[in-house]
Amino acid sequence: MSSTDAEAKNEEAVDWEGPDDPENPRNWNQGAKMTHVLLVSSFTLYSNLAAVMFAPGAQDLVAEFGITSTIVASLTVSIYILGYVFGPFLLASMSEIYGRLIIYHICNAVYIAFTIGCALSTDTAMFLVFRFICGCAASAPMAIGGGTIADLHKPEERGKAMALFGLGPLLGPVIGPVVGGFVTQFLGWRWTFWLVLILAGVVSLLALVLMRETFEPVLLTRKAAELRKSTGNYRLQARTYNKDLTPAQLLARATIRPTKMLLMSPIVFLLSVYCAFMFGLTYLLFTTFPAVFEETYGFAADVSGLAYLGLGVGMIISIGLFAVLSDKLLHQPHGGTIARPELRLILMIWSSPLVPIGFFWYGWSAKYEVHWIVPILGTSVIGLGAFLILMPAQLYLVDAFGTEAAASALAANTVLRSLFGAVLPLAGPSLYDSLGLGWGNSLLAFIGLAFAPVPFFFYKYGERLRVRFPVNS
């Protein structure tokens, strides 16, 4: 290509009007950015609340619908999480073609409609189908929320935003059973869905009014279309436009990308497996709470859900630590070089031993029936460690793979995490029946310790591996 052709091509490429263009989402005022982060965080909160808020009422539904199979009874709760396995691949890829906003709005509408369906269900099949579709729709903010944060914030500004984004997936399962227990006792299991519906409806209406598109390629494409119309120059195209691929080919490529990243990138695969194991452990831990706190410590059924708050306290502490330290670590001078994404893993390296320590603490104190506050303190350590593993890993994926592939990287992470969250708890009863609380939790702790070197390995070799295994295309 000649220099003249190159200049002509540059003149026809539509871009932002300089680094300070107010239309660029990264240049929006802090109020607008925070509004979007809070709304996306609210999406994840109510979608994760719904995952387990119904659990205390599951036995009432089983009795009402005459369910006799233990597998089907378990599915009434876990099929929602299975929706998280199937939804992200399609939703993340569509967000990278059509933008984030339309995906949020469509999925919110679907979620609301099928939550009403769950509340009004009259038989098992109807309930399971509606709840699965709810799970698929609820996976949208989990899959593309990190992409929205990457659209809005430069890498060195993402720590606080990701801390807020991480509230939902981790605090939802903690608060859900507490609220669900009281709602089921006083209002019935159907009201767990009506309550989520009210919350989802309010947040969705606010999103319709306040949210705007944030994805750069979509915004530049719209800008180019307006300029073509106003100038009559039909050669104008967005800087991000790919003339070699049709929309169908772009969608196919974006749909394949999460799978490609999971299978071909050791970074995405190993970090996703590690996160999935940590996420699955927290759900598996929940299966022990009724036996430990109701049978061993004599908690009444209506207050046994308060035992979940130990995890919540640990997570709240970790949110503060993450928000304060994550971006500071990225700002530290490192030999005069530009901060690399691997610096996000420092918090993860420090925190890796905490979850195993928490499981040792919880398991053996519960086995020997030490005062009930002691195992709850152990779960606080688990909550602290789990958040400081999951959030640095997600933020690292966002920073390492950029705005255009962040949603795909997080979709791959969400799929594995949700799969482990749905399946691993099923192993809980047989594990603890065979080994007891002490050695059963110790086995999980030893597996957690085996994963501890993973973040250090990627801290040291991640940059080299990203070059060796490129998956952004």
From Swiss-Prot:
Disulfide partners: none
Residue spans of biased composition, Basic and acidic residues class: 1-12
SUPFAM superfamilies xrefs: MFS general substrate transporter
Keywords for the protein's UniProt record, in alphabetical order: Cell membrane, Membrane, Transmembrane, Transmembrane helix, Transport
Sequence ranges of Acidic residues compositional bias: 13-22
Stretches that traverse the bilayer: 37-57, 71-91, 101-121, 125-145, 163-183, 191-211, 266-286, 305-325, 345-365, 372-392, 409-429
GO-annotated molecular function: transmembrane transporter activity
Region ranges (Disordered): 1-27
Membrane topology: Multi-pass membrane protein
Cell location: Cell membrane
Main location (coarse class): membrane
GO terms under cellular component: plasma membrane
Family of this protein: Belongs to the major facilitator superfamily.
Function: Efflux pump that might be required for efficient secretion of pyrrolocin or other secondary metabolies produced by the pyrrolocin gene cluster.
The protein's name in its UniProt record: MFS transporter prlG
Organism expressing this protein natively: Fungal sp. (strain NRRL 50135)
